């Protein structure tokens, strides 16, 4: 277990506890493992996700912050940049050099100066503004592009279902 990663994660946790961005709650799943965090992300206003609060899991590699964490929504949500298994696909979570399709600028990808807060804010931004040019869920991309009302209806239904309705 990397002491550098542990120290960095504890520092980031303290910062989030002290000054968490609105609509975001995050922290370690247990006291015994600082490398797996649970997150709650409130859907941004004026989006199909506005009425939802979404569970996600952040998994940090042992060499964090040299390598990016993985963020997965549990359960998955319908979104062009979220794989059907719930894994989020955005630039900030991609290692430098991880761009086979040449869609991303190097400065958009992961670097050790990024933080948990920046990741979660980027995910909130992604919920507001999907990037269908670099989609992870092709069906969601097509629905977003070709039938926005149906896309929004399906998102709202999934929110109601997640709330037990």
From Swiss-Prot:
Belongs to the ubiquitin-conjugating enzyme family. SMART domains: UBCc (SM00212). The keyword Translocase does not apply. Induction: By cadmium. There is a cross-link at residue 89 (Glycyl cysteine thioester (Cys-Gly) (interchain with G-Cter in ubiquitin)). Pathway: Protein modification; protein ubiquitination. Present with 2100 molecules/cell in log phase SD medium. The active site is at residue 89. The keyword Nucleotide-binding applies. Keywords: ATP-binding, Cadmium, Cadmium resistance, Endoplasmic reticulum, Membrane, Nucleotide-binding, Thioester bond, Transferase, Ubl conjugation, Ubl conjugation pathway. Catalyzes the covalent attachment of ubiquitin to other proteins. Functions in degradation of misfolded or regulated proteins localized in the endoplasmic reticulum (ER) lumen or membrane via the ubiquitin-proteasome system. Autoubiquitinated at Cys-89; undergoes 'Lys-48'-linked polyubiquitination, which leads to proteasome-dependent protein degradation. Degradation is autoregulated when its levels exceed that of its binding partner CUE1. One of its GO terms (cellular component) is Doa10p ubiquitin ligase complex. Its EC number is 2.3.2.23. It is a peripheral membrane protein. It comes from Saccharomyces cerevisiae (strain ATCC 204508 / S288c). Changing residue 81 to A: Impairs degradation of UBC7-substrates, but does not prevent protein degradation. Pfam families: UQ_con. This is Ubiquitin-conjugating enzyme E2 7. GO terms for molecular function: ATP binding; ubiquitin conjugating enzyme activity; ubiquitin-protein transferase activity. It catalyses: S-ubiquitinyl-[E1 ubiquitin-activating enzyme]-L-cysteine + [E2 ubiquitin-conjugating enzyme]-L-cysteine = [E1 ubiquitin-activating enzyme]-L-cysteine + S-ubiquitinyl-[E2 ubiquitin-conjugating enzyme]-L-cysteine. PANTHER family: UBIQUITIN-CONJUGATING ENZYME E2 (PTHR24067). Forms a heterodimer with CUE1. Interacts with SSM4/DOA10 and HDR1. Interacts with UFD4. InterPro entries: Ub_conjugating_enzyme (IPR050113), UBQ-conjugat_E2_core (IPR000608), UBQ-conjugating_AS (IPR023313), UBQ-conjugating_enzyme/RWD (IPR016135).
